[in-house]
Amino acid sequence: MAWVKFLRKPSGNLGKAYQAGSLLSLAPTVGLLNEPGQNSCFLNSAVQVLWQLDIFRRSLRALTGHICQGDACIFCALKTIFAQFQHSREKALPSDNIRHALAESFKDEQRFQLGLMDDAAECFENILARIHFHLVPNRDADMCTSKSCVTHQKFAMTLYEQCVCRSCGASSDPLPFTELVRYISTTALCNEVERMMERHERVKPEMFAELLQAANTADDYRKCPSNCGQKIKIRRVLMNCPEIVTIGLVWDSEHSDLTEDVVRSLATHLYLPGLFYRVTDENATDSELHLVGMICYTSRHYCAFAFHTKSSKWVFFDDAHVKEMGTRWKDVVSKCIRCHLQPLLLFYANPDGTAVSTEDALRQVVHWSHYRSGEENMGCGKPIIYKPDNSKENGFGGQTKQKENHKFQTDISSLNRSQMQTSGRRAPVKLSHDQREKIKDISRECALKAIEQKNALSSQRKDLEKGQRKDTGRHRDLVDEVLASFKSGSPPASDGFRQQGNPHLYHSQGKGPCKHDRATHESYTSGKVISSSKSQNLLVPGEKTTGKAKSDSGTGYETDSSQDSRDKGGSYSSKTKSRHRGWKPMRETLNVDSVFSESEKRQHSPRRKSDIGSRPRCSKDQSFNNWPKANPKQKGLMTIYEDEMKQEAGSRSSLETNGKGAEKNLSAAESRGPGTSWQMQRTESGYESSDHVSNGSASLDSPGVEGSGAVMDVGGGKAFSEHIKMNSHNMDSMEYISHHCKDHPEGFRKELQDLEADDKIHELHPESHVQIKSHLIKRSQIGETNDKLFPSASPQTLAREHVYQTNEHKVERPDRSKCSERHNTENSEGTGLPFHVDESSVAGKRVDSNETVSPSSLPSSVRTAGLKPETGPLMFWSQQNITEQGYSDNSLSRELTLLSACNADSCQMPKLHCHRSPPPLPPKKYSTASAPRLERVGLSPDVGVTEAFNTNPSSLPKHSLSPASGPSLEGSPCMTQERDKETIQVKQLAANSYPSSCSTNSFQPDQDSTSVCPNETISLTTYFSVDSCMTDTYRLKYHQRPKLYFPESSGHHSNNSLSQTEQVEGSIT
């Protein structure tokens, strides 16, 4: 035998002290007998590896109390054989005790019966499952947090999986589960190695975990939760830090010749974070495990390799035969290749691992029959017994056991559960007061975490109710969906995401019933439990997942472990089911927007520094639900998206789903610049599969936040910023009403003052013009690609929206004047000086229909002059998500519009008949009365000041205007004529550089032009999707003002002005 080598070494000291069962040997030479007809090699291999696992061996030695089941007690059988390993001097020991216990435990299922061959991987899993039941029988295997449970503290991997569709933004509910073995297909593993070799990458040992993850998720595509037709990969996140990780290799009978390739690809070190999509436990982020055991299969026979820690040598166990292989892993590889041994289970352990804590462990051995009778006495009803009444006392006296049982009844809580832990059945729980007190003592740490979770959940529910009261329109359906998810106890959809077949089928292992037929008896393997049964078995009151105890309140799902449930008894009877809810997925915290925003805050600190004053106060989803901000060290379910968002600037919008992906991808590729990437690529809400681009929310990756000069939120508040971000690509034409100017000559004179003042700004910022020009060129490229995507809205649709918007808000006119004046005054005080634009920059500007200009973003000279929206000339600008360059475009192009519009004789309005197709959801219905002749177009309130306006007071030219300089420009039509001449020159210059046949909608991605007859009256409207971040009164005042409309009186001048604008745009490009 191998131990003889120790005796023969002249330089070793083991010759004097070594004995076959001493502490020095740790029984490396003791084998397990497998007599003919027993077919116990699968069990012998599993037992040998468990004995060689230092963490398991020390933990089992430290645990003294358990629930004993007599002949069916696997815990007793293991302790017995481990004691024999330690003290016996026999070369081989019988494994009859544990074989009988295993057969007795699964007698009703006809598994692991005497004389029948079975699977070593299943045997290993079921041994761990039975150990859990012997230590903590009152706890669900998936929710066990007992510190003394070896199975879940050392072996179990607490995971959750989820799918997120990048096309439509929909996401599946997070599904938590527990794995004891992570199964990998050997075929997929070899394919991944081949792909790596094709990329000319060297297979390094530290990349082994990544290879396993790639092989585990290869071809594992699921359908989109919203049925958009996309195939998406599932992501699995590890929430705890197991000290022993078991990898199961699944061999296909058709590819059994891959033995050599698989063995050569194995590594002796496993980097735990690389095995999963993400790990949330801090201890798991740098956890590196060592290979200490391996079970192999060949020709209907099992054997094992184990690393002996004392001698640092690999030992080969083949039933009763034990042989040392050497200190090098190469020796094991050579043995496997030579004997054609197929690796079946790989055991990776933490070299610094320790035994389990015995703080909440049982102190005495309690027999199952007494434990069962104690349950009946407490009124739980007759349980389904785990073993028939002929169970033996195993040498313990009846009176002694009754005393211990009496004490045990007051020490632990009871569970009326099903007979088979692996059958997946659950039974009600009823706890007495004393038992409830014991549970509090056992799970103090879990209780603290539960209180935090409860507080966070309570605040989230209150915020959700507020958002529900505020919400109208299309978001009402979203609230219903969220609340339905809150009340649902079964997370997965019909497609399940856990409805997997048997993960490991060994066709070459003839061992009775096929494993696929027995898959329903397994509950510990992820592949053996379908989502329906898993979702129904997630709840045990007072308990949480192991990973949950180490994570914060952002994990996103609860297990009813709040303190009040313990105070009330934590019972799960029929009377309290309505009060104590089960696991509830909180998918609000999993939305793409909020996670993407948080990840950008952490990953792009230079952007944060540049826009401290301009950061949006909240994203769309955060304003709707008001969830707490995620901790930078968040370990919850939200983390599943963080890497996704680092690699890709937001998920694609639903345009791709609607058949517009090709054009959209092309435009997104052309607009990678810092000012345009977010305009054509949107991030939808994480749980909402929206088909409307107009309601997508912005993220911190948008250029409005990247800019360094934009100052947002001067006086508008969160509602303004939120509304502007969510109303994207809504573009309408600009109207300038000459009649209104004639009725208010004073306001017109003041506007002329503003024009002269604004003419100087380009002198102060010539570099801004260059930047804007290049930016507009990029926009034109996007427009040329996308101007064919959206058909124009029908006149009926526009007329209908015009009627409802007009009647909805015409009663608010007196208040609007005051509010507009207030915002203008605040913004004027914020800037503190008038601004000026150089007239020479007119030729380089155009009307940018993609940008937003609102009362708060008007030049400061207009606001200081006291010009109100009702008393001055009105302009209507399309709404767009705010960018810094958008501010500059607005401020510069407004001057051109007024120059082309204000003719000295008639001051007519240029008509730009561009219509936006509104989202398909119907608008809010109001009584449709006859529309008055005089209406107003609502100005979109903005909350920023343009970068171009932030000039130095010392550099202002001599044409600077102050509020007192207004009367000096009375009767200045000659100035207007001079400006018109300049505009004509601009027109001629543009005609030489750009064909006049080009229309404005070539620069407008989402627009299409329609020709309107002179006698046809169509109201130009903007569709506002209702947001939860504002009340109806707020929206009535600031977001949908009825517009002032006059029938077209001079078609010649309108066409003239339109042609001017088109040609100026042509000169820019």
Curated annotation (Swiss-Prot):
Expression tissues: Expressed in the cochlea. Isoform 1 expression levels are 10-fold higher than isoform 2 expression levels. Expressed in the liver.
Spans annotated as Disordered: 414-438, 486-634, 646-710, 805-866, 946-981, 1046-1069
Subcellular localization(s) per the UniProt record: Cell junction, Tight junction
Record's keyword terms, sorted: Cell junction, Hydrolase, Metal-binding, Tight junction, Ubl conjugation pathway, Zinc
Reactions catalysed, as given in the entry: Thiol-dependent hydrolysis of ester, thioester, amide, peptide and isopeptide bonds formed by the C-terminal Gly of ubiquitin (a 76-residue protein attached to proteins as an intracellular targeting signal)
Compositionally biased spans, kind Polar residues: 414-424, 522-538, 552-562, 674-700, 850-863, 948-965, 1052-1069
Family, per entry: Belongs to the peptidase C19 family.
Subunit: Interacts (via the C-terminal region) with the heterodimer TJP1:TJP2.
Documented EC number(s): 3.4.19.12
GO biological process, one term: action potential
Compositionally biased tracts (Basic and acidic residues): 598-620, 805-826
Domain of life: Eukaryota
Gene: Usp53
Active site per UniProt: C41, H301
Protein name: Ubiquitin carboxyl-terminal hydrolase 53
Gene3D superfamilies according to UniProt: Cysteine proteinases (3.90.70.10)
List of residues binding Zn(2+) 1: H66, C68, C73, C76
A Pfam entry, by short name: UCH
UniProt-annotated binding residues for Zn(2+) 2: H132, C144, C149, H152
Sequence positions that bind Zn(2+) 3: C165, C168, C224, C228
Transmembrane parts of this sequence: none
MF terms (GO), sorted A to Z: K63-linked deubiquitinase activity
One annotated Gene Ontology cellular component of this protein: cell-cell junction
Domain (USP): residue spans on this chain: 30-351
Function of the molecule: Deubiquitinase that mediates 'Lys-63'-linked deubiquitination of tight junction proteins, such as MARVELD2 and LSR, and which is involved in the survival of auditory hair cells and hearing. Specifically cleaves 'Lys-63'-linked polyubiquitin chains composed of at least 3 ubiquitin molecules, while it is not able to deubiquitinate substrates with shorter ubiquitin chains: recognizes ubiquitin chain in position S2 and catalyzes en bloc cleavage of polyubiquitin chains from substrate proteins.
PROSITE patterns: USP_3
InterPro entries per record: Inactive_ubiquitin_hydrolase, Papain-like_cys_pep_sf, Peptidase_C19_UCH, USP_dom
